Amino acid sequence: MTRSLKKNPFVANHLLRKLDKLNTKEEKEIIVTWSRASTIIPTMIGHTIAIHNGREHLPVYITDRMIGHKLGEFSPTLNFRGHAKNDNRSRR
């Protein structure tokens, strides 16, 4: 279910403050965040945001094609290592 157009996209306040500060200074530095639910907005383009995946922060460079998506979509939390090769219990 999509968000209502009457509402604005969710972006964490601390993330907006950091972005506004960097945009006024015209500096580029890595922004560390735990807010995976924040929506990518046009003011984030060109910045690198380190998104927490539960274990570490993964740096993601924001491009114009990412607008409207959530930050958590670009930081996978699970690491699938494949199925067991010799699983004799499941064959019984």
From Swiss-Prot:
Record SUPFAM superfamilies: Ribosomal protein S19 (SSF54570)
Chief location: plastid
What InterPro entries does the annotation carry? Ribosomal_uS19, Ribosomal_uS19_bac-type, Ribosomal_uS19_CS, Ribosomal_uS19_SF
Q: Which domain of life is it from?
A: Eukaryota
**Pfam families associated with the record:** Ribosomal_S19
Kindly list the places in or outside the cell where this protein is found, as annotated in its UniProt entry.
Plastid, Chloroplast
Gene Ontology biological process terms from the UniProt entry:
ribosomal small subunit assembly; translation
GO MF annotations, alphabetized: rRNA binding; structural constituent of ribosome
* Keywords (A to Z) from UniProt: Chloroplast, Plastid, Ribonucleoprotein, Ribosomal protein, RNA-binding, rRNA-binding
Recorded GO CC terms: chloroplast; mitochondrial small ribosomal subunit
Described function: Protein S19 forms a complex with S13 that binds strongly to the 16S ribosomal RNA.
Which NCBIfam families is this protein grouped with? rpsS_bact
Q: Which family does it belong to?
A: Belongs to the universal ribosomal protein uS19 family.
* Protein name stated in the entry: Small ribosomal subunit protein uS19c
Naturally occurring in which organism (per UniProt): Fagopyrum esculentum subsp. ancestrale
Q: Give the gene name.
A: rps19
